[in-house]
Amino acid sequence: MPRQEPPDFLAGGKSVRIDELNLLVLPDQVTASSALITGEIDYQQYVPFDMIGRLEKARGVNLLGLGGLHMFQGNFRLNHASPPFDDPVVRRVLWKLVDQASMLQAIGVPTRYAVTDCTSFWMCGSPLETKVGAEAFRYSVDAARDELKATSYAGQPVVMLQVSGSILQTAAKVLAQAMRQAGFVVDEQVMDWGTVLARRAKKDGWGLFAVYSNGIDMISPLTHFYVANTCADYPGWSCDKAIPPLLAAFARAPGQAERRRIAEEIQQVAYDLTPAVSWGQFTIPAAYRASLVGLLQSSFPIFWEVSKRA
């Protein structure tokens, strides 16, 4: 029996109001969007950016574009176990080579679905949003070039893993261009996502790759992939021994004010450590037929409380 209260994202009542739910895997996102327009399907989880305009004009179709923790955070994950990013000074140069507005424009995110200057590890629009440490995050190729000259970097190629035909590849190419302008030698290697996962498991043979994550995973130091796994056996192998005790203190904190204070302290250390560099915060909207009633506000599909009008 469901709880007798209104639903609230993953909490609250969970009443089932449909007889059957069919989950379909369609060959590509454009095919899925076309099927939604013709009424062959009722819901599309992620709408490709170049289909948003068409879906907004389609009769009987609504878009669900959310903010805050329901957005996505893009990151470039760095390999701390292998040169040149085993040197923290070299890693920190990248903070000056990422222009989030340009990245998001390049992958086609409409401005209404983008946060173009988010410097918070814990997402913008979240309870822990903070700018502590963010003075390092200032785009300037000239400043990056000067900083790189003062590091141990000796011209060795930086292997950049790229996912073929994806927004991740687009974001990576924008960074690769800026890195070359600053003096890095970049070796762009294109592959599928499965190969990226296999390659990143090794401590050598790669320098960085682009990825994006659901904001729900990134709004807390305890769940942020590249902070929560500090000093763990996790691809990228970033470690600052100051962070694990701070994570433990955050978990024990008695209230929000104390959690926020500790989160700010963790972010300051994380900016110095540079486990990853954010390339932007954005929404990938869902789309659904107007006949669906009761869809909850969520960046992933939740179908309790949903009913379908005839």
Identify the role of each PLM range.
Residues 30-40, 58, 88-89, 173-182, ...:
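Short helices/loops that flank or line small-molecule/ion binding pockets
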Residues 177-229, 262-263:
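Periplasmic binding protein-like
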Residues 150-167, 208-212, 254-290:
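Bilobed periplasmic-binding protein-like "clamshell/Venus-flytrap" ligand-binding domains
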Residues 81, 85-126, 170-171, 270-278:
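Periplasmic-binding protein-like
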Residues 2-18, 55-70, 77-87, 123-143, ...:
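Short, solvent-exposed loop/beta-turn-alpha elements that line the ligand-binding surface or hinge
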Residues 47-58, 215-220:
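A ligand-binding cleft/hinge motif common to bilobed small-molecule-binding domains
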Residues 96, 113-150, 165-170:
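Structural transition elements
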Residues 3-54, 176, 185-187:
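Ligand-site clamp/hinge motif
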